[in-house]
C-alpha cells in the first residue's frame, strides 16, 4: 500500500515533471514516501534528469535507501550510465561503496555495462573500492573483462584498478 503522496511524488519524478514535483514538495510531503510498488520518488525518478534528484535530495531524500531488489539509486545511475545524476547523488553523500544484493558496488555495474565515463569518474574522483569483490568473487575489472568491455579494462588497469583477477 502506498504511503500518503507516495504515488503522486513518484509519478512526477518518473515523468521528470519538475513543476508538479516542486508543487508537491512545497506541501511538506514525506520525500521518502513509498509508492504502491514500495519505491520512493528518488528510486523511480527519470535518471537523465539530475535536477529532479537535486530537488528531492535538497528536501531530505535518502540516496542510500534500497528497493526490494537491493538497488540504491546510485546503482541504477551507474548501471544506466548517467554520470550527471551519479555526480549529483554523490554531492549529497550517497555511499559510493554501497553493495547491492549480489555484493556489487556501483563501479561493478558501470564496468559490466561498459560505461567508460562513469567508470573513469568513479576510479579517479571517488573513494570507490576498486578491489572490492562481489559475492561471486569478481572485481569490477573482472566483470568488464568477462563482458568484453576492453576500454574499461584498459582504463582500470592504467589507473591501478586492474589488479588480481578471478578470470586469469
From Swiss-Prot:
GO terms for biological process: negative regulation of cell growth; negative regulation of cell population proliferation; negative regulation of stem cell proliferation; oligodendrocyte differentiation; regulation of G1/S transition of mitotic cell cycle; stem cell proliferation. One of its GO terms (molecular function) is cyclin-dependent protein serine/threonine kinase inhibitor activity. GO terms for cellular component: cytoplasm; cytosol; nucleus. ANK repeats lie at residues 4-33, 37-65, 69-98, 102-132. The keyword ATP-binding does not apply. It comes from the Eukaryota. InterPro entries: Ank_Repeat/CDKN_Inhibitor, Ankyrin_rpt, Ankyrin_rpt-contain_sf. Highest levels found in skeletal muscle. Also found in pancreas and heart. Keywords: ANK repeat, Cell cycle, Repeat. The keyword Cell cycle applies. Heterodimer of p18 with CDK6. Interacts strongly with CDK6, weakly with CDK4. Inhibits cell growth and proliferation with a correlated dependence on endogenous retinoblastoma protein RB. Belongs to the CDKN2 cyclin-dependent kinase inhibitor family. This is Cyclin-dependent kinase 4 inhibitor C. It comes from Homo sapiens. The gene is CDKN2C.
Amino acid at each position: 500500500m502506498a504511503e500518503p503522496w507516495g504515488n503522486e511524488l513518484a509519478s512526477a519524478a518518473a515523468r521528470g515533471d519538475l513543476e508538479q514535483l516542486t508543487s508537491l514538495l512545497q506541501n511538506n510531503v514525506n520525500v521518502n514516501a513509498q509508492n504502491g510498488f514500495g519505491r520512493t520518488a528518488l528510486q523511480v525518478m527519470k535518471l537523465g534528469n539530475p535536477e529532479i534528484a537535486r530537488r528531492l535530495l535538497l528536501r531530505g531524500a535518502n540516496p542510500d535507501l534500497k528497493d526490494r531488489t537491493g538497488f540504491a539509486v546510485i546503482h541504477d545511475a551507474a548501471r544506466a550510465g548517467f554520470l550527471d545524476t551519479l555526480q549529483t547523488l554523490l554531492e549529497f553523500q550517497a555511499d559510493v561503496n554501497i553493495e547491492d544484493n549480489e555484493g556489487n558496488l556501483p563501479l561493478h555495474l558501470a564496468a559490466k555495462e561498459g560505461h567508460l565515463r562513469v567508470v573513469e569518474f568513479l576510479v579517479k574522483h571517488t573513494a570507490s573500492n576498486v578491489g572490492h569483490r562481489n559475492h561471486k568473487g569478481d572485481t569490477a575489472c573482472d566483470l568488464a573483462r568477462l563482458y568484453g568491455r576492453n576500454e574499461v579494462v584498459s582504463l582500470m588497469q592504467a589507473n591501478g584498478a586492474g589488479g588480481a583477477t578471478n578470470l586469469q
